[in-house]
């Protein structure tokens, strides 16, 4: 399939000739590093390859070293794609790939291993995508078949009382501590347990009912206040923490004020320096006028 050479495309014979010229320099050209000496050596090799390529045939259009380098990169990429397609199709190696690809594989055997690694990564990513898709579909099925949640609404009554677990009994300290731990766990999980006399089980929400969040804040606040009343050490720690916060805020305020004053002083000094420079320039100008002969005659 050797046709007439054009200015922008390469024929099959031109591609094969380029690969034959590149073959002695493959070791240098395939060294992937940013060393200056290697880059200079690569440029020198491409200059030599371009000279030898243009000396092959007179009827061919002249090619630059940059154009030949771009063609070489395209041939390598095309060889990788062709090997991947050949592996996916599981066809005969010799009959399915083109001559430039065979030449590239002979020159650079590691391209075949690259294609194997890329194919393995593609298979792994496909399996991961299928597993994620299956997990998403199963989660969607679980959401679709989830039963309707029954909301617990508390009637707006004035006789809402705290939970019985909040009442402290001096005779059962251990039992009280266990109850308080269970209550803290329940409050942390957001569970509300009002008395059964004030609970109305309904399927629809009512705008006149008290939200569960208000009940949660009420119970958690009362429980924390009861804990604070029972433990003076916690009160002392909270007091010290509050004092530290106030001291830090005071120090930060002083720091901000000092920084603001320092900026003001700096601005004032810069203004004074600028005025002094203006005065100096005025004095220089007056001295120059006095020293010049044309001004002194006046």
From Swiss-Prot:
Localization, UniProt: Nucleus
Cross-link (Glycyl lysine isopeptide (Lys-Gly) (interchain with G-Cter in SUMO2)): 94
InterPro entries: FSBP, Myb_DNA-bind_5
Any one Gene Ontology cellular component term annotated for this protein: nucleus
The organism's place on the tree of life at top rank: Eukaryota
Pfam families to which the protein is assigned, alphabetical: Myb_DNA-bind_5
Sequence ranges of Polar residues compositional bias: 192-209
Keywords on record: Isopeptide bond, Nucleus, Ubl conjugation
One term of GO molecular function: identical protein binding
Region entry Disordered, spans: 191-213
Function statement: Transcriptional repressor that down-regulates the expression of the fibrinogen gamma chain. Represses transcription of GSK3B gene promoter via its interaction with APBA1.
Self-association and partners: Interacts with APBA1 (via PDZ 1 and 2 domains).
Protein name: Fibrinogen silencer-binding protein
Species: Rattus norvegicus
Gene name of the record: Fsbp
């Amino acid at each position: 399939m050797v046709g007439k050479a054009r200015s922008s495309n390469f024929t099959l014979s031109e591609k094969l000739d380029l690969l034959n010229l590149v073959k002695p320099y493959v070791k240098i050209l395939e060294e992937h590093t940013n060393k200056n000496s290697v880059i200079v050596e690569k440029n020198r090799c491409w200059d030599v390859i371009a000279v030898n390529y243009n000396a092959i045939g007179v009827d061919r259009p002249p090619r630059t070293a940059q154009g030949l380098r771009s063609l070489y990169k395209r041939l390598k990429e095309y060889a990788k794609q062709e090997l991947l397609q050949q592996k996916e199709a599981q066809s005969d190696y010799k009959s399915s790939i083109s001559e430039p690809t065979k030449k590239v594989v002979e020159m650079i055997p590691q391209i075949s291993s690259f294609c194997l690694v890329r194919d393995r990564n593609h298979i792994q990513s496909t399996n991961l995508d299928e597993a994620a898709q299956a997990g998403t579909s199963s989660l969607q099925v679980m959401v679709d078949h989830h039963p309707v949640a029954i909301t617990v609404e508390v009637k707006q009554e004035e006789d809402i009382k705290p939970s019985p677990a909040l009442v402290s009994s001096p005779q059962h300290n251990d039992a009280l501590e266990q109850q308080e731990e269970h209550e803290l766990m329940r409050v942390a999980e957001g569970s509300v347990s009002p008395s059964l006399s004030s609970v109305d089980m309904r399927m629809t929400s009512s705008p006149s009912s008290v939200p569960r969040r208000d009940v949660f804040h009420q119970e958690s606040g009362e429980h924390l206040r009861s804990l604070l009343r029972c433990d003076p050490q916690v009160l002392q720690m909270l007091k010290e923490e509050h004092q530290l916060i106030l001291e830090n805020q005071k120090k930060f305020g002083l720091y901000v004020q000092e920084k603001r004053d320092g900026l003001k002083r700096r601005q004032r000094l810069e203004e004074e320096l600028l005025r002094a420079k203006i005065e100096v320039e005025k004095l220089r100008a007056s001295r120059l006028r006095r020293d010049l002969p044309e001004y002194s005659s006046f």
